[in-house]
Amino acid sequence: MIEVRLFATFREGRGKIVFMEPEKVSCAQEVLDVLEIPAEEVAIFLINGFHSKLEDSVKDEDVLAIFPPVGGG
């Protein structure tokens, strides 16, 4: 299974952690497609703790983390 950890607004309606079958997604962009998250809304995308590109492949037992832009004042 691929573990997808969602942060901030991405959790709304999806929860904190989503699990995906590795047969259903082959790259980071496909993970976003399944979750219906537009790529332009992603500020940070990590695969196993490393900054990654949406073209990077994902495989069984990977842990992904997806962060939207965060602001504060």
What are these regions (language model features)?
Residues M1-G72:
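Ubiquitin-like/PB1-type beta-grasp interaction modules and other compact soluble beta-rich domains
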